[in-house]
Amino acid sequence: MSMIVIDGSYGEGGGQILRTSVALSVITGKPVRIYNIRANRPNPGLRPQHMHGILALKELSGAKVKGAQVGSTVLEFYPGRARPRHIRVPIKTAGSVTLVLQALLPAMAFIGGSFEITGGTDVPWSPPVDYLRHVTLFALEKMGLRAEIEIKRRGHYPKGGGLVVGRVEPWEERKPLVALEWRHIELFGGISHATNLPEHVASRQAKAARERLSEFYDVPINIYEEVSRSLGPGSGIVVWAETDVLRLGGDALGKRGKPAEAVGREAADELLEQLTSRAAVDRFLGDQLVPFLAFAGGEIKVAEITNHLVTNVWVVEQFLGKIFEVEGEVGEPGRVRVVG
């Protein structure tokens, strides 16, 4: 089978190209060569956090891999015979659990299996695990995919130590997703957590988010407050709007010197901003859905076309040909439809 060749510096030019490329290699059985990996970044090449996703997909598919070392700017991935497995990913730092799952979920959807990942559950520059559980999986369930994620322990920067387990059922009935504009909001949900911190931190984050959301919408607000223990302190909040179509989300992380009230308001404001265009899909979910839309079909309207989304469309089309139509400019609301 001929090898797919991907320029890793294209578009957003980050780790997402790697995650999507290797996941699609597993799904399609096509080997892939990725060059110029993170070429435009201050520290080019593979970083430790990228290795975890690649090695998890290697294990899932029995692949042969060349160039899988930190600093490498070229990776070759030759998928083997994929079968359902229990995948363990021990990230010894606060490396993102959810970025590993962004690589693992699309591939596992076609195979089934279970996973156990340690690392950072709520860390900068990646979706919080509660967003993945309550927003991403909610959308994937509408597409016929059944998956579960359970948080056993939180992990924050810099110590990590979080533990997430879950399973994915083989995706047998693929349902096209048509998610254009929402008409009404049924409720706001959320989870405010504080780890190795006083209980009032979670309460104050939740209270500030409730107050902010209620200024704009008169609907029920259910934000759960969670207090837990782990290797190090940290806090955060994820809020979502459950609409008549999908859920849209917003989130924020606490940090030393940042008042809990500011954290709660930040998450609420991010969600409120996503709601202004009435698009059914928020800007974070849009790019996550692209690999699944490729196989299920459908059309979505996103609150914002992002570089991540455009890049993910490009990567998918290197494997499957021209199947997407993207309408709208980066930074603006827009539509993504499957035409192939």
Curated annotation (Swiss-Prot):
Mention one GO biological process in which this protein takes part, according to its record: RNA processing
Which compartments does it reside in?
A: Cytoplasm
Q: Does the keyword rRNA processing apply?
A: no
Task: List the GO terms this entry assigns under cellular component, sorted alphabetically.
Answer: cytoplasm
Q: Where is the active site?
A: H308 (tele-amp-histidine intermediate)
Sites binding ATP sit at Q102, F284, L285, G286, D287, Q288
The UniProt entry, under Gene3D superfamilies, shows: RNA 3'-terminal phosphate cyclase domain, RNA 3'-terminal phosphate cyclase, insert domain
Alphabetically ordered keywords of this record:
ATP-binding, Cytoplasm, Ligase, Nucleotide-binding
Q: Which InterPro entries match?
A: RNA3'-term_phos_cycl_insert (IPR013791), RNA3'_phos_cyclase_dom (IPR023797), RNA3'_phos_cyclase_dom_sf (IPR037136), RNA3'_term_phos_cyc (IPR000228), RNA3'_term_phos_cyc_type_1 (IPR017770), RNA3'_term_phos_cycl-like_CS (IPR020719), RNA3'P_cycl/enolpyr_Trfase_a/b (IPR013792), RPTC_insert (IPR036553)
The source's superkingdom equals: Archaea
- Catalytic reactions on record: a 3'-end 3'-phospho-ribonucleotide-RNA + ATP = a 3'-end 2',3'-cyclophospho-ribonucleotide-RNA + AMP + diphosphate
UniProt GO MF annotations: ATP binding; RNA-3'-phosphate cyclase activity
Entry's EC annotation = 6.5.1.4
Q: What's this protein's family per the entry?
A: Belongs to the RNA 3'-terminal cyclase family. Type 1 subfamily.
Cross-referenced NCBIfam families? RNA_3prim_cycl (TIGR03399)
Q: What does this protein do?
A: Catalyzes the conversion of 3'-phosphate to a 2',3'-cyclic phosphodiester at the end of RNA. The mechanism of action of the enzyme occurs in 3 steps: (A) adenylation of the enzyme by ATP; (B) transfer of adenylate to an RNA-N3'P to produce RNA-N3'PP5'A; (C) and attack of the adjacent 2'-hydroxyl on the 3'-phosphorus in the diester linkage to produce the cyclic end product. The biological role of this enzyme is unknown but it is likely to function in some aspects of cellular RNA processing.
> Per its record, how is this protein called by name?
RNA 3'-terminal phosphate cyclase
Question: Which species does the entry assign this protein to?
Answer: Thermococcus onnurineus (strain NA1)
Lineage here is: Archaea, Methanobacteriati, Methanobacteriota, Thermococci, Thermococcales
